[in-house]
Amino acid sequence: IQVLASEGGHIEYSPKSELEWELNNWLTNSLNVNLITCERIVSGAGLSRIAEWRLSKSDAKNHPFQKYIKELKFANDLEKILPEKICKLSNEGDILMNEIENIWLGAYGSLLGDIAIHELCLGGLWISGGTAPKHFKNFKSDLFLKQFSDKGRLKDMVKSIPVKVILDENFGLFSAACRAKMLLRRA
């Protein structure tokens, strides 16, 4: 296994549906930026942004999550609390929260499929980070796998790439310690 450091989240977000274009335009205006990167969507903060956008639509004005957000408005760890709550409600059958989670998951799958092609991850793609361990069951879902492999002529190649999730949230620290130990041995 070779670990490749990446700032792949800074790749430009590529909306694929009318709904995703609407989200992209809302984010562009809301964040006052010219370019929306995948990190703005495919992250814990991104899941919160998708929820904020979706809850701003008229059909969601009276959703119970509106009250929950107002109660937490000044919480220090809002970017951690909201994604967990969105996923919990989605798993409990909340249709709107499920829609929000699916938009996020589709974008995540599409981005990882692009990265798998770009880096030729033929031996497998390992996902780590803050959101990955919390959503690992979703990386086996039909929605994720469809978005991951929907890559035109390279669809069959991407379908053959195994996707794994590193569940240890301290994986990066462990890896850094191993690298430091290796460098010390050389000195």
Name each model feature, range by range.
Residues 4-31:
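A short, charged helix-loop
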Residues 22-187:
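ATP-binding/phosphotransfer module of carbohydrate and carboxylate kinases, centering on a glycine-rich
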